[in-house]
């Protein structure tokens, strides 16, 4: 469970760039953390992201097509990131690029999810 939350933090960094809070977000925090759980080893300083990690990143991006979805996912990720021990901010910021995903926002735990637009 702690690993899922840590992964979610990393995903949050990535998704907060893509997702934001909304009243009816289709993306649940469980989905966000579950999709990004395979990324935890990379997010905490491991070697490059695994294929399953990148598949989760792409799945999460596809699951958040609207501004509200992206903001909701972003907020879930920020919460999860706070629970990941030894989160490597550089690896979190590099995750989208390593997975060949383009996100027009900075990936960071300090990202303001409310500013994310679709």
UniProtKB/Swiss-Prot annotation:
Residues 1-25 form the signal peptide. Belongs to the plant LTP family. GO terms for biological process: lipid transport. This is Non-specific lipid-transfer protein 3. One of its GO terms (molecular function) is lipid binding. It comes from the Eukaryota. Pfam families: Tryp_alpha_amyl. It comes from Lens culinaris. The keyword Ion transport does not apply. Disulfide bonds join 29-76, 39-53, 54-99, 74-113. Plant non-specific lipid-transfer proteins transfer phospholipids as well as galactolipids across membranes. May play a role in wax or cutin deposition in the cell walls of expanding epidermal cells and certain secretory tissues. Keywords: Disulfide bond, Lipid-binding, Signal, Transport. The keyword Transport applies. Gene3D superfamilies: Plant lipid-transfer and hydrophobic proteins. PANTHER family: NON-SPECIFIC LIPID-TRANSFER PROTEIN 2-RELATED.
């Amino acid at each position: 469970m702690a690993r899922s939350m840590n992964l979610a933090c990393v995903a949050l960094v990535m998704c907060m760039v893509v997702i934001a809070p909304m009243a009816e977000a289709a993306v649940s925090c469980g989905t966000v953390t579950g999709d990004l759980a395979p990324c935890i080893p990379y997010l905490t300083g491991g070697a490059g992201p695994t294929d399953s990690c990148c598949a989760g990143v792409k799945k999460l991006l596809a699951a958040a097509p609207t501004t509200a979805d992206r903001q909701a996912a972003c907020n879930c990720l920020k919460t999860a990131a706070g629970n990941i021990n030894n989160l490597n901010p550089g690896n979190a910021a590099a995750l989208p690029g390593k997975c060949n995903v383009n996100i027009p926002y900075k990936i960071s735990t300090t990202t303001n999810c409310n500013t994310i637009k679709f």
